[in-house]
């Protein structure tokens, strides 16, 4: 299947647009003057933010909700691993011959190439750490785009755009999504047993994090207890590079 390099004036259909990771990407692509339509069963905070910005969202699980201009085979379709293969929209676009049907992580991987990328990974602590870096950047006048796994109250959004110097993203290990990223810098906050429906055991999860570190171009920072080669470590103990 063809991978898309999205620029301007594309037509993009999001299946599950209200997801915290999907909605931030939708906002980014909408800023680039693409035509965005999304489906989500929920009317959550993310959906309300999208609608407030002018992005059309439907909660009707019906092919009748797809307008004519979204039915051509050149429409880009974005979905998440949470969307089952028998989803009626996904089945429709596959049967329709759409060549650009991609997971959210693949689109985020393309976005991460646009500027110097800082990726925050870890079983726990990703959103908190990303939010702290966002605060430091914003307070320091550093220009950045941030794709955050939570709604920042001070911005009322999970997508923040102040410029192009850096791209700040959460690196999600679910479904090995973070292997699509292209980080210059990365932080791993923790590695603990999680998503074993995907990985089977902790060993496979650790191996996936190791593969993620192999994609880091410049600097890797990890919790000192993580058994992965790193440039800098952090801890509450004094035997790490940085400690409190």
Predicted regions and their residues:
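Short, conserved SAM-binding/catalytic segment
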Residues: 49-56
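N-terminal Rossmann-fold NAD(P) dinucleotide-binding loop
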Residues: 22
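NAD(P)-binding Rossmann-fold cofactor-contacting core
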Residues: 33-49
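N-terminal Rossmann NAD(P)H-binding glycine-rich loop of SDR-like oxidoreductase domains
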Residues: 18, 26
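Conserved N-terminal Rossmann-fold NAD(P)-binding element of oxidoreductases
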Residues: 13-17
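Acidic beta-strand-to-loop metal/phosphate-binding motif
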Residues: 76-80
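Short acidic-hydrophobic, aromatic-tinged amphipathic segments that line or gate anion-handling sites
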Residues: 56-61, 102
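Phosphate-binding loop of NTP-binding sites
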Residues: 3-10, 28-34, 51, 64-71, ...
